[in-house]
Amino acid sequence: MAAGTLYTYPENWRAFKALIAAQYSGAQVRVLSAPPHFHFGQTNRTPEFLRKFPAGKVPAFEGDDGFCVFESNAIAYYVSNEELRGSTPEAAAQVVQWVSFADSDIVPPASTWVFPTLGIMHHNKQATENAKEEVRRILGLLDAYLKTRTFLVGERVTLADITVVCTLLWLYKQVLEPSFRQAFPNTNRWFLTCINQPQFRAVLGEVKLCEKMAQFDAKKFAETQPKKDTPRKEKGSREEKQKPQAERKEEKKAAAPAPEEEMDECEQALAAEPKAKDPFAHLPKSTFVLDEFKRKYSNEDTLSVALPYFWEHFDKDGWSLWYSEYRFPEELTQTFMSCNLITGMFQRLDKLRKNAFASVILFGTNNSSSISGVWVFRGQELAFPLSPDWQVDYESYTWRKLDPGSEETQTLVREYFSWEGAFQHVGKAFNQGKIFK
């Protein structure tokens, strides 16, 4: 039976996974989450900690036997028993399936929606609306799956349930008000069943579900940001005023910078994340302003204004055009589910919006449909390999680079951007389209 120490910061939902698993398996897990034993942002940056956990991330687990492991899913797996991991190869595969689904499909939109309401991330209206729709899709998917099931895998709680519940936790506590969640009775029933298990309650306590959807509070956001002490301006003495300007500048340079206020654990967790590098920073500047085209596309007529603007200003050296097709049309069944594939991909590519535009269309009807689209990317190569966050979906599509000067490209851009035309290359009728902008 596993025994050891879990390093984390207080109320870390990722750490909850291992702690709940330990409640089921009987693993002896001690938690160090506060000074003087563990100070997040300091202890996890010491040479001693980094020798054991090179990434410097928490949660991190150190066994009494010296075994060390980081990443919350790996820790939860280690402290689990066979029943939680899946007692057959098939059950184990399904557990991994749902654990992976939680990380890839639930975490991104949940963070985008919830973090601004906690004052730890700035609010972006469009991103939040996209996140809401993605959460709605996820809850619907779970609701359909759980219609005839008590738990996600088998008839008992597994790591699948523990992981997905913990990933949904802040959604249910912060933003899923009754009017939003009432459409998903099976998901709600399963969530409540899990959090009321003694093993869950021992870690989570009593979970109070959201009564009114929390909103972004600009004042709260400003208050949670690190501030610098700014000394009050005082009238200088006569002697001070008489000092040469150069001397006064030197004194200001020598003055120690104002110390920052100490951040709370949540802010420290975010601050500890490595600063994201711009994947397109290596590209030369371009004359084509994508945001201006997007404004034209959103507010003006597509055929008479937006498209002429696009071709007049498109920089073929700084940008590229691509045609994509979904590789597995035989797997597409209900059109609403096919549409969810597109929406899910767009959500996971949220940080690419500044450097991309696309029109992706669903053609056909239930059990006879296809998905294809035209994309605009910064640079001359596909953008997806530039960031691991963007690589979840793109391999499910074929990609063909288009020649901006060809008649075929002109036709494809016109038809896909306007959602009008013969679409002769498809062989199916237009059903609906979605714009990535």
UniProtKB/Swiss-Prot annotation:
EF-1-gamma C-terminal domain span: 276-437
Composition bias type Basic and acidic residues, residue spans: 221-254
Pfam families: EF1G (PF00647), GST_C (PF00043), GST_N (PF02798)
Modification type N6-acetyllysine: residues: K147, K212, K401, K434
Modified residues (N-acetylalanine): A2
InterPro entries: EF-GSTs, EF1B_G_C, EF1B_G_C_sf, Glutathione-S-Trfase_C-like, Glutathione-S-Trfase_C_sf, Glutathione_S-Trfase, Glutathione_S-Trfase_N, GST_C
Record location of the Glycyl lysine isopeptide (Lys-Gly) (interchain with G-Cter in SUMO2) cross-link: K285
Subunit structure: EF-1 is composed of four subunits: alpha, beta, delta, and gamma.
Function: Probably plays a role in anchoring the complex to other cellular components.
Descriptive protein name: Elongation factor 1-gamma
